Amino acid sequence: MRQGIHPEYQQVLFHDTNADAYFIIGSTIQTKQTREYEGKVYPYVTLDISSASHPFYTGEVRQASNEGRVATFNKRFSRFKR
């Protein structure tokens, strides 16, 4: 393999902010933030969702907050029935 062309593979601290869970995973991601975790300093990346908070993996059932366009239309104009 050629030297100097491959990204640096390192241990990175990922933080799922919804579940407040931390994961140390090998990655080539580049970040300017660092955090100390269990006595070591790691590059730090925040996540909105991971296996610790995703409904598929947690088994939670969530109601979708977005209604379809037809349902929104019907709700808005239901009072104008003939």
Curated annotation (Swiss-Prot):
Transmembrane spans: none
Source superkingdom: Bacteria
Keywords for this protein: Ribonucleoprotein, Ribosomal protein
GO biological process: translation
SUPFAM superfamilies found in the cross-reference section: L28p-like
Protein name in UniProt: Large ribosomal subunit protein bL31B
Subunit architecture: Part of the 50S ribosomal subunit.
Gene: rpmE2
Molecular function (Gene Ontology), one example: structural constituent of ribosome
CC annotations in GO: ribonucleoprotein complex; ribosome
UniProt entry tagged with the keyword Membrane: no
Family named by the database record: Belongs to the bacterial ribosomal protein bL31 family. Type B subfamily.
